Amino acid sequence: MDKQEAKHINMPSPSTCEHKSVEAYLFIDPLCKDCWEIEPFIIKLWLEYGKYFSIRHIVTGKVDGTNASSHKWNKPANIRFVWEKTTSLHGFSCDGKVHMQEASSTPYLVSMAIKAAELQGRKAGSKFLRKLQEYIFLENVSNPDCELLLACAKDSDIDVEEFKKDLYSASAKKAFQCDLKFTNEMHITEIPSLVFFHANSDEEGIKIAGTYSYDVYVQLLKELVKCEIEPEPLPPLEVLLEATQFISSKEVAFIYDCSKQEIERELKKLQLKRKVQMIDVKCERYWKWIAKEKDLV
């Protein structure tokens, strides 16, 4: 989700704090389930505090320690290593922590595909990544091939022809190499990991490895912003569903801090209005947005 969605999602209004004063980097492996299950935390954080920070997904991989540059954030002294473990919370994290040296490396083509989608914008890249993870974890696709990647591009509503050109392009390759280099510079040894920096400060950044309670991420953001910040009201349920297109009852319940029973009562009302389709996958209930934009009020 980015600024382009402002017409659908009520973006935060200006405040006394500096706009987008924090830069966040989420280090992921698209084949790691924990990296998929952290997404509800990121969505909720963005909806409530998105005016204070920007976020980028960084695709990790095997990196060479000799490639690190002399960037001001490269030195370990400039990153405060906060929590280095993964905790199972809210029923999302299910496989425990995944150390870089133990994880199987993501196929090169998959990483290139994510970068190719991002060449059409961060919003396009995020939509493509989410669709790819749905195929991997809900359809049991362990090694996505070119055909599936093209299907993800189509399902994500990005320019498929442009995606085909970019898939093997020098631009996508360079973008992926930059991700690998940055992963090395930040000394990422566990995924998912979040690194926060103040955009206009030489102060140390904060790294949090693994998955924690939502309040932890909010507290870290407040610490970096250095002024009182207040959450924006969450958007109406229909707006969230249109923005995400496909989301589980569990994710929606987490975002709105409600029980699954409460959320599903509201979702079933939308189902009766033919705005969503209910899909049961792996003992979990998902909801697909099927209404046209003109149906929204």
Curated annotation (Swiss-Prot):
InterPro entries: Adapter_SpxH, Thioredoxin-like_sf. It comes from the Bacteria. The keyword Manganese does not apply. It is found in: Cytoplasm. One of its GO terms (cellular component) is cytoplasm. Keywords: Cytoplasm. SUPFAM superfamilies: Thioredoxin-like. Belongs to the SpxH family. Adapter protein required for efficient degradation of Spx by ClpXP under non-stress conditions. Interaction with Spx stabilizes Spx and exposes the C-terminus of Spx for recognition and proteolysis by ClpXP. This is ClpXP adapter protein SpxH. It comes from Bacillus cereus (strain ZK / E33L). The lineage of its organism: Bacteria, Bacillati, Bacillota, Bacilli, Bacillales.
